[in-house]
Amino acid sequence: MKEILITNDDGYESEGLKKLVKMLKKEFKAKITIVAPASEKSACSHSITLTKPLRFVKVGKRFYKLDDGTPADCVYLAFHALYKTRLPDLVISGINKGANVGEDITYSGTCAGAMEAALQGISAIALSQFYKKSEKELDYKNALKITKKIIQNIFDKDFPLEKKEFLNINFPAKSKIKGIKICKAGKRVYNFEAHSNINPRGVEYYWLAAANLDFEDEKNSDIVLLKKGYATITPIMLDLTAYERMKKVKKWLKANNE
C-alpha cells in the first residue's frame, strides 16, 4: 500500500486541505497521514524551528497539528517521528488558498513543505488554487480532478523528476480550464507595502503587506498561463547555482584583482 503525507501552510483547518484529504481517501487505496501547522503560516518560506520544542497534537486518526510549527517542520518531524519503518511514497503540500508562482515560490510555505520532502529524497508536489478577490467561495473541483490524475501518474509511472526536485502546480480560478501547461516560473514585479500605526502605549508598529500582484508579461510563464485559464506545472530544482554566470563572476574577480 502506498503512503502519502500531507501538509500545508494555511493550517490544519483549511478548506483546501479538507477537500484534498476527502478526495484522496475516496480515490486511492493509500495510507494517508496529515501533519499541518496549528495556525496559518503563509509566506514563512522554508523556515524550521530551532529555538523551542515542538509537539504533535492529535486531531484525528493519523491526523496531527504541529503546535506553532511551519510546513517544513511538519514534514521534517513527521519523517523522524511518525515513519518508523519507511518514509512515505509521496508528500503533498496544499491545496493552498492562492497561487504560488514566479519568485513567490521562495516565500511560499506551501512550496517549502514539498521542498523539505525533496531535500530528504521523497517525491513531492505543491498544490495551489488561484482565485480572484471577487470570488466569495473557492471552487476546488478542477484542482481535485487534476490532482487525482497527477497522483495516478506518479503511482503508475514513477515520479518524473530527479532527487532534490519537486513539482509546483497551480490551478486557475476559472470554472472551465483550457488545459494543463508545463512551464517556467514567471518574474514578479514586487510592490510591497508597510502600514504603520501607533499602539495604545504610544509605540509604533507595522503591518507588512503585498500590493498588486504584478508580473512581467512572459509568454510561457506560470502566471500568464494561469491567468489565461490553464493549470500550470513547473518542475523546481533546489540547486540555486546560476551556472551561466560563473564564468562572468570569475572574469569579474580576476579583473578586480589585477
Curated annotation (Swiss-Prot):
Reaction equations catalysed: a ribonucleoside 5'-phosphate + H2O = a ribonucleoside + phosphate
Subcellular location: Cytoplasm
Any single Gene Ontology cellular-component annotation: cytoplasm
Residues that bind a divalent metal cation: D9, D10, S42, N96
Catalytic activity, EC: 3.1.3.5
Keywords, comma-separated and alphabetical: Cytoplasm, Hydrolase, Metal-binding, Nucleotide-binding
Molecular function, one GO term: 5'-nucleotidase activity
Chief place where the protein resides: cytoplasm
Top-level lineage group: Bacteria
Keyword Cell inner membrane: no
Annotated family: Belongs to the SurE nucleotidase family.
UniProt function note: Nucleotidase that shows phosphatase activity on nucleoside 5'-monophosphates.
Record's protein name: 5'-nucleotidase SurE
Organism encoding this protein: Campylobacter jejuni subsp. doylei (strain ATCC BAA-1458 / RM4099 / 269.97)
